[in-house]
């Protein structure tokens, strides 16, 4: 990326020299409907350490008109370059800087994003500043430890709404003058501007009153279930304020559902932005509502952990995200009135799976990553930073005890409110409340990479009584290219003993909790007891480790996986089977057989939908190529059978309809999709609504049944932003050279597409059953990649680098071509990481394909 980086050392030096007091930011957005640029005027007051010196402030702008430092005009041609304005001759004590610039609206989801809704032709704006993009809107010292107050003044078109971190004032002559914020970091400031629809309420408890707002575009207003969102929000307020013993720290709490958002949501202080796909236009399963609720709670937790108390530098990003990820699940599991008390099942099913995958890539890194610059942090929003970190926090809670954990957190908030911290500050507070020395624990869990494997070693006598039980811990070699050494870690785990009852259900009859440390840990608590049908290590999912079953337990689970009475042990066994498949320990054909034998009894809809995705991935990537079509046929026939057998109108019925649409292939199956679309056939209870229609259309386009005219006709039914994206996916999915060339040109050779449409085109372009058609693009990908990375914003370049990598071409040739590019292209560290991660997927797929082929012999 050209000239826009910032190193940790530069940030450290700047923080040593400067203390920032306040920003006054004046933006003229009256031309937002037309786009282009807008006037940005920033006044910053800051103090300089004794002796004075020189520094710089960050700004990304097409034009800088004025830079005035302490009343002296600086030559903009001399001081402004790339993303920095040099500040020479700083005086000890108070300095005042004024910068006048023209900043640009974006369509990449970075900085001030501008979107025009095709329904009403109105522009909608919102900011996204994490990590370094406040500098795209106003001149800022773009690092988290230079906190300040921020006072925004915004001029906007008449009839629009302007939302920021502070309560929204009454406009005067279409000018909104907000009161200053508390001291916060620049990356959690925000502006959301446009003719948004809103619903308002108040959170009230024990004399506290916090205004609540929910916003979306008017074209989504009919779908906005504000009452449900407010309900989850209030539960979060109740639970977090009790657990944290610290009142919500801002004056109001708005949640704004915004278009073309790159992430799930963003924790702007008091003004959380959330992707508007969470305003559901069509029927979704309860799993989607659970994920939305988790997102709401995640961002609310950040108001304390991240906004009130903020990391000093981005190497502690993991603590921000891990804590919020842990807190969302803990709140859903324990908050009174929660609709998702099984949230730890979802955590095991989704977050842990993400973490285990990320931790086995060549880019694996310690949870506490070494973040040397902005390029490092931009690719570090990964499964280790979020999911492994949250898993390890769950382990820490088990290790120190829940009461001690939250007492430590309470002390941490009180001690560091509106300040910046390091990991040692939190660990110190937890050591005080728990009495445990956490230095050794931290070194093993936070400062090393990789994942352990836990295996049971069991001996029984002739009567089936356990005579010896131990847990063997392994530390597999780290992936090639990863830094560090394999590490054995201390684990606090539970062991569950399960037997079949008279109804054929697997019921837990005993539970042992213990510390596992070193290579072999004896478990005397189980010696002398009758051997149960299943012994499950890491029951209750307290620790972070791969778990393997002993031979007898595996045999019982293979036959009775769906018979566990509780969802969490089922999820743990499903996860173990999937992990074994990815590790080439279980053949894809055997994994499919296991899923087909147990999925019909799986009640957790989130687990069912994960199994759908995993089976498709396994067949597409991990099956022996000669067996792939037969396995796809078997799976698709099963999806149709389950669709027809599912309870009418149920979540399971909808999930099976989507799974069927994803792989429908025979003329009869495709005829059924077509007939469900035009209404000549129906399945009782199945509403073929807008989103399901698009799933059917996209599949019919991908197999060549539908062309441009059918896609255009469907778009006429749904002339919305979502419809535009779905149509783009369908057009790119068509199995023709012309369709692929058009899609490729629009993404790689042009930079005109907005972020969400580019993502949609990439999703359609890559079809796993179009390998031959896509083969020619392997070489074109490598030829274009460096130029794309150099010329696009980070978000847009990453979409292309990851999304268009030839992952469907599972072959040694793809590995060789990737290696040749890595050796010759000299990519920077961030791009090298992304390509190396994709390469790792090819290696894993080749191993799994070999294992599947061997199982057929």
Curated annotation (Swiss-Prot):
Binding site for Zn(2+): 298, 302, 321
Pfam families registered for this protein in UniProt: ERAP1_C, Peptidase_M1, Peptidase_M1_N
Site (Transition state stabilizer): 386
EC number(s) per entry: 3.4.11.2
PTM entry text: The N-terminus is blocked.
Primary location group: cytoplasm
UniProt xrefs under InterPro entries: Aminopeptidase_N-like_N, Aminopeptidase_N-like_N_sf, ERAP1-like_C_dom, Pept_M1_aminopeptidase, Peptidase_M1, Peptidase_M1_aminopeptidases, Peptidase_M1_dom, Peptidase_M4/M1_CTD_sf
Catalytic residues of the enzyme: 299 (proton acceptor)
Manner of cofactor binding, per the entry note: Binds 1 zinc ion per subunit.
Coiled coil: none
GO terms of molecular function: alanyl aminopeptidase activity; metalloaminopeptidase activity; peptide binding; zinc ion binding
Requisite cofactors: Zn(2+)
Annotated keywords: Aminopeptidase, Cytoplasm, Hydrolase, Metal-binding, Metalloprotease, Protease, Zinc
Residues bound to substrate: 130, 264-268
GO cellular component: cytoplasm; extracellular space; membrane
A GO biological process held by the record: proteolysis
Record field: catalytic activity: Release of an N-terminal amino acid, Xaa-|-Yaa- from a peptide, amide or arylamide. Xaa is preferably Ala, but may be most amino acids including Pro (slow action). When a terminal hydrophobic residue is followed by a prolyl residue, the two may be released as an intact Xaa-Pro dipeptide
Record's subcellular location: Cytoplasm
Its biological purpose: Aminopeptidase with broad substrate specificity to several peptides. Shows strong preference for leucine but also cleaves next to Arg and Lys in peptide-bond-containing substrates.
Subunit: Monomer.
Family stated for the protein in its record: Belongs to the peptidase M1 family.
Protein's name in the database: Aminopeptidase N
Organism: Streptomyces lividans
Gene this chain is encoded by: pepN
